[in-house]
């Protein structure tokens, strides 16, 4: 806060970019051969750095100005040449359901969660090995938390406003992003871990002791922002709602963007992983906080990385409606071992279908597994659910393949990351960002004669006033109705009473033979003259 460093770069096209510098303390890692114990210590004097990713090849000029004690001076100026520009930052594509890079090449995320490492995972060295193994199978995506106390904890050191206190964490993130760039992996950076701002109640089941896993019991009561442990805030709600708390987080954002915004290995900024768990007693707090932080990120991130946020419960996605996010994300966990797993493909498509129908931005499943409490090693040791979920999501119209959880205790120990290879190879051959991709109906056929039975569709939602997502299409296939009938209102509303609920229902079906449609109407309202209109293949039939 006592000095600032600003650099101006002018490119070969005459466009200028002004970037802030950042203060850093160089670090050095020391560990034994297998890095079971990782030590990160300061080395040398603190320095100011500026990081710039040139968007074009050619010659650039630069000038560095330093302001200290109210006086500004030019500390350096010169020029340099860039032989070839990198692929560039990832953004929403020409086809808004998918992603692309600045050079217009398609980017279709195929990867897994890589939330963190820890001492038992060989620290930073172990994380680098995971990135290497992902690259070996052709994956291009990972998801990293930078707000956990046992690995990269940018919000977990004291004093909470001290840059010096987070320099070991910053070294880890430097190293990880540089390694990710080497291997062609783009990382979604989770900036706020919800559990650090809520009360952790433990697991409802007993997790196995083998394989080893980090202790993730940290929560608000151990958060360094909590006044009970020396922080400045009485509650998590105060941090997210007060000007002091918001200014503190903006300062962290400013440092994050200045130090790591240059990297093409940053896929996106995820502000909060589960926004509905932050100050749930007053949802307007987190919605207002997200609106303010999204606007601030767009202001300071000149590379325009995509911005998103998530919720735990997909039914609470409306919490994010007022926030202008670049893409949507949802979690998908079944409840193994408490309940047996259901149809994984059908559940995946039912979750994604209503979100994809809007078509206004990409949708990703950012976490999935058979259970949210520990890895499904006993229930699915071969990882069959990984294949079905990733392929179902990739071919559903989502912006990328679903990303599994349990990287450290399931995917890598059992070498299940091999399943990413065929999907990654397939995805590389598809121009996702530019093609006009449309869903199609497919079916298996046989040589023998077939007999057909009537298909009865029932189980509609009988809640009065229930409104489905707008412009939803229902696809009737041999396997299922997508989205399910429970999302179809049982009532059809007219234009006189309850007109706000009036919406046409559209069903898409490809019958295998001549078919008769029968619609049963149990009763009509006696308060207004009702008339049902049925259109088949654009032709009125009733």
Where in the sequence are the language-model features?
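Aromatic- and carboxylate-lined catalytic core of secreted/periplasmic carbohydrate-active enzymes
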Residues: 4-5, 362-363, 371-374, 388-542
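A generic structural motif
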Residues: 8-10, 67, 100, 522, ...
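Ligand-binding face of N-terminal immunoglobulin V-set domains in extracellular IgSF glycoproteins
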Residues: 2-8, 12, 18-83
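Short capping micro-motif at the N-terminus of alpha-helices
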Residues: 19, 75, 99-101, 108-110, ...
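Short loop/turn segments at connectors of secondary-structure elements within structured domains
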Residues: 15, 60, 74, 513, ...
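Catalytic-core region of carbohydrate-active enzymes that cleave or remodel glycosidic bonds
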Residues: 179, 185, 296, 302-306, ...
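Active-site mouth of glycoside hydrolases
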Residues: 4, 67-69, 85-339, 347-349, ...
